[in-house]
A protein has these predicted regions:
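Charged DNA-binding/catalytic regions of mobile-element recombinases
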Residues: 1-203
Length: 203
């Protein structure tokens, strides 16, 4: 999938028998998913879904301000580079200012040295909820539920490449640009951010 230019999926939760590692970051969010502007608070997580060829995994980074997916990665593995690739896409696209918060769970990918290193390189602050607590990352859990309902459960997926392409198209061509959210005043994430940008420029 990397050769095809498609980089890291999971609503059937990734948690298995592994005991969660001690959190290297405190919980800076405490279930208060509120941001006054873009690129101040991101949340990130992994989901997975089966195909006839095996599982596909997706990591996503969601901007709390607009619910826009600012970074994602799709792969056939769940190693730490899956979440690092999603973070790198987000930082490359958005260029967040130092001190922006990235909130995750305590999965081994997010407690890994390499993920923490990438956060420090970008000047970002890591934040982690409690182990095995979906309510501590509820916004991105809601995003996965939407993807599950609108895309993943709509058909049987024959190949990993087929599903990876469908996820890419769902995020970039549907979820971000036109899909409307009642929580955003019936605007899409892209429309909501554009409105904020225009209002800020006019102020």
């Amino acid at each position: 999938m990397r050769a095809a230019g498609i980089g890291g999926i999971c609503h059937q939760r990734k948690r298995g028998r592994h005991r969660p590692a001690p959190a290297p970051h405190e919980d800076l969010v405490r279930r208060r998913f509120v941001a006054e502007e873009p690129n101040r608070l991101w949340c990130t997580d992994i989901t997975q879904h089966p195909t006839s060829e095996g599982r596909v995994y997706c990591a996503a980074v969601l901007d709390v301000f607009s619910r826009q997916v600012v970074g994602w990665s799709i792969a056939d593995h769940i190693r730490a580079e899956l979440v690092v690739d999603a973070l790198q896409m987000a930082t490359w696209r958005r260029r967040p200012e130092p001190g922006a918060i990235v909130h995750a769970d305590r999965g081994p990918q997010y407690t890994s040295w390499v993920f923490g290193h990438r956060l420090r390189e970008a000047g970002l602050l890591g934040s982690m909820g409690r182990a095995a607590s979906s309510v501590d990352n509820t916004m991105i859990e809601s995003f996965w539920s939407t993807m599950q309902r609108e895309l993943l459960d709509q058909q049987h997926w024959t190949s990993k490449a087929e599903l990876a392409t469908a996820i890419f198209e769902w995020i970039e061509a549907w979820y971000n640009p036109p899909r409307r959210h009642t929580s955003l005043g019936n605007l899409s994430p892209t429309e909501f951010e554009n409105l904020h940008t225009a209002a800020t420029a006019a102020a």
